[in-house]
Every structure is written in structure tokens, then in C-alpha cells.
Regions:
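Short glycine/serine/threonine-rich phosphate/pyrophosphate-binding segments
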Residues: 92-97, 118
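Gly/Ser/Thr-rich active-site loops/lids in small-molecule metabolic enzymes
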Residues: 174-183, 219, 225-254
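ATP/nucleoside-binding phosphotransfer catalytic cores, i.e., glycine-rich phosphate-binding loops
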Residues: 16, 41, 205, 236, ...
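Short hydrophobic-aromatic micro-motifs
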Residues: 152-161, 165, 211-212, 216-220, ...
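A generic structural signal for short beta-strands and their flanking turns/coil linkers
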Residues: 197-199, 213-215, 238-243, 277-281
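Glycine-rich beta-strand-to-loop/alpha-helix junction loops that act as flexible
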Residues: 34, 88-90, 111-113
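Catalytic core of DAGKc-family lipid kinases
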Residues: 22-24, 46, 54-55, 64, ...
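ATP/NTP phosphate-donor binding region
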Residues: 3-85, 95, 131
Length: 319
């Protein structure tokens, strides 16, 4: 079983501008998810230790177990009220730490060592661990929005339907067949698209009710580009609104057609594509519980689902 760990670094305090010179050194916990991506935990730890030292930072390793414990470690780290808490991992790890940090004065530092690293990419944080470590000591703090569904935070997106089914099947393939995350996701996508089903939902958007039968509902923390070669990216994370996307199309051919609309920059012109920008969304279903994927992590949640945006509730160090 891979191990994960917490590092402690000595860095300067964080402000909503350029970081000051480290005149008063503080201990800052850095959470490392040794299971992110396809790397091995021990090798990854050694690489990160070297990257931190090249950045002039002094790490100390605190081992911890996998899963939800990352939130407990983050809470314990916050007891000392550090100015910066650094998370090294994928979007799931960052999301868990952000869930603890939101609404506090502690800033999130990001070392993106996961598989997709969407949050880091959208904020312009280097994907190289050494360069990202430099940012932690020399960058600036900004405030970004955090999404929430039934009290659970997400920094990128939350979705139900097709993608949640894909995550469930991906996790099963990783567990049973020991496939890599990327390979398992590809096989899961092929399986789900071949058997896609609709969800009977009642959406309350901006005080209006929308009855729909949809293969998915995608809720983004801010607006996602849905067209062309920048599809799936965000130009800002402080717009103060959730962006909700869904379609009435179902079946593999219908979804492929939707994807082609996106590729040619015509997604918003597709007849069955729907989008709303709102601070709050309520999703009702005949089902007592629904599977919801939040930043790639699967959760079974009681209905109705209450989605909210928490504007500028998270401080993050960026270049």
C-alpha cells in the first residue's frame, strides 16, 4: 500500500500581494498524497524533498494513511494557525485540503503531482514540482471561489450521471484489475457510453423549475470553456457563480454528436444543450441518494442536492 505524508517547510508569511521576505520563518505543513497519479510514494517523496531543498526550503516528513484522513491531518495542521498549508497531490487531495482551509486565513500552496492537475493549470501554477515549490516561497496570494454540494467542497466541478458512473467503474478497475488511473478511466468511459442512461431530475435554477431527463448534470466552480481546443478550462476562479451544464441527448451517438459540436466551437448552439450561471442550484430526484463525483472523488449523497458557490473563500498562492 502506498504511503502518504505531511512535510513541514519553513517559509515566509502570506499576504494578498507578493510574499514578503522570510524574515520571520514559520512552520508550514505540506500534505503529500503518495497515491496521486501513477508514481510510487517513496520515490515521489524523495523527488519532492530534493525540489523543496533546491527552492531553499527545509522539509520534514510526517507519514499518514490514505483516504479521508487527509482532512484530519489538515485540521491538525491548522491548529497552529500556519500562514500557508501546502498540498502535494492531485485534484482530489487539493480539494480535500481546500475543504478544510476555506474560510480561514491560511493560504493553500499547490504542488501538482496528480494525474490531471486541472486546478493548478487553471491558476497558472507550474506542473513541475521544483518550479511549483519556488512559487510557494515567492508567489502572491489571491482569493478564489469554492463550490459546495451538500456541505462538501469542490474546487473544480461536481457532476452526476455519466461522469459519476465513469468514476465508479474506474475505481473498480483500479482496485480489481490494478490498471492505471488513465487506462481505467478510458475503459470505464467506453463501458458507460455504451450503456448511458437518463436521470429523472427536477432542477431549481434562479427560482425557476426545470424538469428534465438528462444523462448528466455538470456543475462547475465558475465558467468552463465548452468549445474548441480550450474546452474544459477556466479563465477565472473568482466570478462568484456556479455554471451548470446539461443536455437532453442520450445514448452514445447523441453524446458523440454533442462532443463534435464542442470540437467545432458550436456547443452552445446545440439544440439540446442547456447552461445556467447561478449562485445556487437545487437538484431533486425520485431516488433517495445519487452518486456525485466531486473533483474526481465519488460520493453517495442524499437528495435533494444543494449546490452553492462560496465566493472568494479560499486563499491560494499563485505565481
Amino acid at each position: 500500500m502506498r504511503r502518504a505524508a505531511v512535510w513541514v517547510l519553513h517559509v515566509g508569511s502570506c499576504m494578498d500581494a507578493s510574499l514578503p521576505e522570510p524574515l520571520r520563518l514559520k512552520e508550514v505543513p505540506v500534505i503529500l498524497n503518495g497515491g496521486s497519479g501513477d508514481g510510487h510514494g517513496d520515490e515521489e517523496a524523495k523527488r519532492l524533498e530534493e525540489a523543496f531543498r533546491k527552492a531553499g526550503l527545509e522539509p520534514r516528513l510526517w507519514p499518514f494513511g490514505p483516504g479521508e484522513e487527509v482532512r484530519e491531518v489538515a485540521r491538525r495542521a491548522l491548529e497552529a494557525r500556519p500562514p500557508v498549508l501546502v498540498a502535494a497531490g492531485g485534484d482530489g487531495t487539493l480539494s480535500a485540503v481546500a475543504d478544510v482551509l476555506r474560510g480561514t486565513d491560511t493560504a493553500l500552496g499547490v504542488i501538482p503531482v496528480g494525474t490531471m492537475n486541472h486546478f493548478a493549470k487553471d491558476l497558472g501554477i507550474p506542473l513541475d514540482a521544483g518550479e511549483a515549490a519556488q512559487v510557494i516561497g515567492t508567489g502572491r496570494c489571491i482569493r478564489v471561489d469554492v463550490g459546495e454540494v451538500n456541505g462538501r467542497a469542490f474546487i473544480n466541478n461536481a457532476s452526476l450521471g455519466i461522469y459519476a458512473d465513469m468514476v465508479r467503474k474506474r475505481e473498480r478497475q483500479q482496485r480489481r484489475l490494478r490498471r492505471s488511473k488513465r487506462s481505467a478511466m478510458l475503459w470505464a468511459a467506453l463501458e458507460v457510453l455504451g450503456r448511458s442512461r437518463r436521470l429523472d431530475l427536477r432542477l431549481e435554477v434562479d427560482g425557476r423549475v426545470q424538469e428534465c431527463r438528462a444523462p448528466f448534470v455538470f456543475v462547475g466552480n465558475n465558467d468552463y470553456a465548452m468549445e474548441g481546443f480550450v474546452i474544459g478550462t477556466r479563465s477565472r476562479l473568482d466570478g462568484g457563480l456556479l455554471n451548470v451544464y446539461t443536455t437532453r441527448r442520450c445514448g452514445a451517438l447523441g453524446l458523440i454528436g454533442l462532443a463534435l459540436h464542442a470540437l467545432f466551437g458550436r456547443l452552445r448552439q446545440a439544440d439540446d444543450f442547456m447552461q445556467w450561471s447561478v449562485p445556487h442550484l437545487r437538484v431533486e430526484s425520485p431516488r433517495r441518494r445519487l452518486l456525485v463525483a466531486t473533483d474526481g472523488e465519488l460520493n453517495s449523497m442524499e437528495t435533494p442536492l444543494e449546490f452553492r458557490i462560496r465566493p472568494r473563500s479560499l486563499r491560494v498562492i499563485v505565481p
